[in-house]
Design a protein with these regions (language model features):
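Short, well-ordered turn and helix-capping elements at secondary-structure junctions
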Residues: 12-16, 62-68, 99
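HotDog/MaoC-like acyl-thioester-processing domains
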Residues: 66, 71-72, 82-135
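Hot-dog-fold acyl-thioester-processing enzymes
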Residues: 2-59, 114-135
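Generic structural signal for residues positioned in beta-strands
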Residues: 7-9, 63, 108
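Hydrophobic beta-strand-centered segment that forms part of the acyl-chain substrate-binding groove
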Residues: 39-90, 106
């Protein structure tokens, strides 16, 4: 299995499924978002405190490829890796069904930092990535 910087295990809930009995497409976006937030919290990041300091992280682009559908009750492993590209922080994310590790979705999410209303060069991300390297 591919190596990841961060993983999170969760379970599909009934209300996340459509009439076909599979996870509704937008819920994969929620799964990925939740994983990113948990990852950032594990680094000590807090979006509320950042905002109070005039620093806001925004998603600038999302691309999700749907490979195999998850169903109600399925357990899954939501995984991510991260790197900086120019001013953006790029999250590469996979969701694998458990226990067989079948790839359900893969996605790329790009994020930028706006400080006091202005797009930055991503210096905040540089500091965050240094903390990851030192872990």
């Amino acid at each position: 299995m591919k190596e990841y910087l961060f993983t999170l295990t969760d379970k599909v809930r009934d209300y996340e499924c459509d009439l076909q009995g599979v996870v509704y497409n937008s819920n994969y976006h929620h799964y990925m978002e939740h994983t990113r937030h948990e990852f950032l919290e594990s680094l000590g990041e807090n979006f509320g405190k950042m905002h109070e300091q005039g620093i806001d992280a925004f998603v600038s682009k999302v691309e999700i490829q749907f490979k195999n559908s998850l169903r109600s009750g399925d357990r899954y492993l939501s995984c991510l890796n991260v790197y900086k590209q120019g001013v953006k922080l790029v999250f590469e994310q996979d969701i694998n069904r458990l226990p067989d590790n079948v790839l359900a979705t893969k996605g790329t999410v790009e994020s930028v930092i706006v400080e006091n209303g202005r797009l930055t060069r991503g210096e905040y991300f540089d500091e965050m990535l240094k903390r990851i390297e030192n872990k």
